[in-house]
Amino acid sequence: MDVSITSDMFNYSFKIEMKKKLRIFAEHGFKYIHWCDDWNSDVVYSQKEIRRYSQLIETAGLRCIDVHGTATSSIRIDAEEDALQDQYLRLLENRIEFCSSVGGDAVVIHPPRRRGKDYSPSLKRSLRVFEKVRRLCEELGITLAIENCFPEDEEAISFYLDKFPPEFVGFCFDSGHAHINGNFDQLMGFGERLKALHLHDNKGEKDDHQPPFWGTIDWKRILRWIKDSRYAKPINFEITHNPEFFSGNADEYLEYSMSAIQKFISLPID
């Protein structure tokens, strides 16, 4: 079973420059990455930057399987102001093109957050974005994978999956968010549309993004569900180093993470 690691693993602690961090991912046994840099910024990659990142990934001996889309607190998929939603649209188009250029097949996006009792205005507002990027996604072979983020996300995910075909819209499962929100049972029903994975552990309280078995997630249940789903890509881990939890250096954290990952994928499934 092949595995993948998120590219922003050290962005919030050691801040290792791109070329070096890609190299050490490969040195510790990873062959695949999920691109998660700039996931919460308004950075638009230039064609020169896209070519550079693509070359760095290839030179490191890695393959990018999918890309995290980007947004900010105001530049959202359901932004009420057209100018802000247009900015979101530009960012999403940029990441779709980037994903295609680096060899990925899916861009992960966050659904709108419920604002008030009625969810439908935000969901309907977001449809403008899907309609605008659909042709680009189809031309480049990119799927939009809706990530579970909040307790009410099953409603949003169902809304999008019912409205659009699997070639265009799929599901990104985030184990940490599901554990905090207590909605894994509801999310299991989306296994047929599983297109991307954000696997990481926590203790049910904070979004700690730690390796398997660090927290209290039932990893055997998750592995069984993934194997029963239609997911066919490398298993991706959205693990990020936090010096509050691990005092060693980057190499030691990668060794610890890879050991936990190997334990996870080797779990016996009844």
Language-model region placement:
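N-terminal small/glycine-rich loop or linker at the start of catalytic domains
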Residues: 1-8, 66-78
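Active-site-proximal loop/turn and secondary-structure-junction residues that shape catalytic pockets
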Residues: 9-11, 37-39, 71-73, 111-115, ...
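Acidic (Asp/Glu)-rich catalytic clusters
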Residues: 21-27, 45-67, 94-103, 134-139, ...
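Charged helix-capping and loop-helix junction motifs
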Residues: 46-52, 85, 89-92, 120-130, ...
